[in-house]
A protein has these predicted regions:
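Histidine/acidic-residue-rich, glycine-tolerant segments that coordinate divalent metal ions
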Residues: 136-192
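Conserved acidic residues
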Residues: 131, 172, 551
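A residue-level signal for conserved active-site and pocket-lining positions in enzyme catalytic cores
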Residues: 30, 134, 292, 485, ...
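Hydrophobic helix-and-loop "lid/oligomerization" segment in the mid-to-C-terminal part
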Residues: 2, 9-131, 152-153, 204-444, ...
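Mid-to-C-terminal polyanion-binding domains and interfaces
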Residues: 3, 69-70, 314-360, 393, ...
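Acidic-glycine-rich active-site phosphate/pyrophosphate-binding loop
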Residues: 66, 166-176, 264, 521-528
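Short alpha-helices
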Residues: 90, 170-213, 225-229, 428
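A short acidic, amphipathic alpha-helical/loop segment
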Residues: 144-148, 373, 480
Length: 577
């Protein structure tokens, strides 16, 4: 039932003006990812976009400066994912380093409070003595919460990166690169990136006002927060444009050098990751899921506490707690995925083909895991997916993931225009969105969503593609090139890790674990013998001892085991020839 994906080779921009001393392979890879100049390859902090281009930031720092001077209580209100946790921790640590003593934080509980600065969350902040609320990674759609804070006399600064609606909340200051009047060139900052920029602007403002001189303290080195910026940016799967690559590279470099928070060190240990060899993908696939598990199954306050703590022993205890939650999440997800595949089979049987957009619901699914489920089903069937779970009181909460060619939030906005009573609320980005609706309206939503996607999407986009960087020569299949590629990142969303294709003789094949295919291959045209592994293989097709030759889509990788390093390939797709 899994779709067979088609291979397509990426095309390079022939007009790109890249440095002449770049190896030809890197020139090809960068040019095919839209890099047109050496400036876009800058990885030092001097290449960062200036904070002055963020609209609303001057107003925000003035409010914070006055709050610092008056000693009023600041409450940072975060979100229950990895971006929200890193944003919250960064803001608290940053303001403490800048000289604010009266600061605390509050992270809404996914199950009790829902997303964002709701009136109920404002009441919680008020109960904790809030005299100023600063939202991070949320707030742009919190009209009711901001209005409620106003009635209580609590000013609100909104920092967010989610797409705004037609109207903005009546906050005292709003910083969001996606505001219509904001000239900040990068629209891809994560919530933690916006929070970091606010700290940079605040430091400059405080320095100009003589704040540090008055207190006889040195302005803090805010680069110490870049490990959190890198983790939140990669974990939130925002596009790694030139500016986000700088932020991520700088954070990765600090982690590799051992200059990171104890909480990040503890996450690395429990994930069995070597800090010195850390790649951006490790942040997304090892650290991020463990941090996210707190918000998915329990309370993200555990994750924020981990990132804030200064003691490695305490951090290890908290990281162990997150690791256990992540294991539980995996078990829940596995069961939900099996149920989702049964639903897909029923849909296929009823209409011969799957709808262009899948909306699925099961009364026993877990609210905190539907986002991952939607992502898994999207990858399997290559079409937009929204998965729903019960939220109590006869309502459902859904999480959607999209494919290239369909802007998920725009699609929901169109549905809301066509059918105003269909959804209770919605929000999100191009590739991910969240929504809620009444349970009895699910079948209507399922039908309308499928129809809209079918109308909007070119059917060709539903045929899964493997986009390759082409073949490697035998000489390029080496440890040196693998290391070159590792160092050439950071790779990530919209700046994908290099993927190559080629024909190989299949010399050995066997299953390891339950679903991983271990192989030894040799390039058909000659070249080195290569060990390879394909994760989560379709075990109804592999191993197949009748297959002697295959076409592979693969990544060049370095396998590190017990101090030894060897060349291997990570196989994304395998086609028998």
């Amino acid at each position: 039932m899994k779709q067979q994906r088609q291979l397509r080779r990426r095309e390079a921009d022939e007009t790109a003006e890249l440095p002449a001393d770049l190896p030809p392979l890197l020139r090809r890879l960068y040019a095919s990812r839209g890099v047109r100049s050496a400036r876009e390859l800058e990885r030092s902090v001097k290449g960062m976009l200036p904070w002055q281009q963020l609209s609303g930031i001057d107003n925000a720092v003035e409010i914070l400066y006055n709050a610092f001077r008056e000693g009023i209580r600041i409450i940072v209100v975060g979100d229950f994912d990895a971006d929200g946790a890193t944003s919250t921790a960064l803001s608290v640590l940053g303001m403490r380093a800048l000289g604010c003593d009266n600061i605390s934080y509050l992270v809404p509980n996914r199950f009790e409070d829902g997303y964002g600065l709701s009136p109920e969350v404002v009441d919680q902040a008020k109960a904790r003595g809030a005299q100023l609320i600063v939202t991070v990674d949320n707030g742009i759609s919190s009209h009711a919460g901001v209005a409620h804070a106003k009635t209580l006399g609590i000013p609100v600064i909104v920092t967010d990166h989610h797409l705004p609606g037609d109207t903005l909340p009546d906050a005292d200051a709003i910083i969001n690169p996606n505001l219509r009047d904001c000239e900040f060139p990068s629209k891809s900052l994560a919530g933690v990136g916006v929070a970091f920029y606010l700290m940079l602007a605040l430091r400059t403002f405080l320095r100009d006002k003589g704040w540090f001189d008055e207190r006889n303290i040195a302005p803090p080195n805010l680069a110490e927060l870049l490990d959190l910026v890198a983790l939140g940016t990669v974990a939130d799967v925002v596009p790694l444009d030139a500016n986000n690559r700088i932020l991520t590279w700088q954070g990765l470099s600090r982690i590799r050098a051992g200059k990171c928070r104890p909480g990040i060190k503890a996450l690395l240990e429990i994930s069995n990751r070597d800090p010195q060899q850390l790649a951006a993908s490790d942040l997304g696939f090892a650290l991020g899921p463990r941090l996210n598990a707190a918000g998915r199954l329990d309370d993200m306050s555990v994750g924020v506490a981990l990132l804030l703590c200064d003691n490695l022993g305490e951090a290890r205890v908290l990281a162990s707690e997150l690791d256990a939650l992540n294991q539980t999440r995996k078990e829940i997800e596995q069961g939900m995925q099996a149920e989702a595949l049964i639903l897909c089979e029923k849909l296929e049987r009823s209409s011969e083909t799957l709808p262009g957009g899948l909306a699925m619901y099961h009364p026993e699914w877990h609210q905190g895991v539907v986002g991952i489920l939607a992502s898994r089903i999207k990858e399997r069937f290559h079409r937009p997916v929204i998965a729903f779970a019960p939220a109590g009181d006869g309502t459902l909460k859904g999480s959607g993931r999209s494919i290239q060619g369909l802007h998920m939030r725009d699609a929901l906005e169109r549905l809301d225009t066509l059918y105003p009573d269909l959804m209770i609320k919605f929000g999100g980005h191009a590739m991910a969105a969240g929504l809620s609706l009444e349970e009895h309206k699910f079948e209507q939503f399922q039908q309308r969503f499928g129809e809209l996607v079918t109308e909007w999407l070119d059917p060709a986009l539903l045929q899964g593609e493997v986009i390759s960087d082409g073949p490697l020569s035998a000489a390029e299949m080496s440890m040196e090139v693998a290391q070159l590629l590792r160092d050439a990142g950071p790779w990530g969303q919209m700046f994908p890790e290099p993927l190559f294709d080629g024909r190989f003789r299949l010399l050995q094949q066997r299953l390891v674990g339950e679903r991983h295919l271990k192989v030894m291959v040799e390039p058909v045209g000659g070249g080195p013998l290569l060990d390879g592994i394909a994760f989560n293989i379709d075990t109804t097709c592999w191993p197949d001892n009748g297959v002697r030759e295959v076409e592979l889509a693969y990544k060049l990788d370095i396998n590190e085991f017990r101090g030894n390093r060897s060349l291997q390939i990570i196989i994304d797709d395998i086609w028998p020839l």
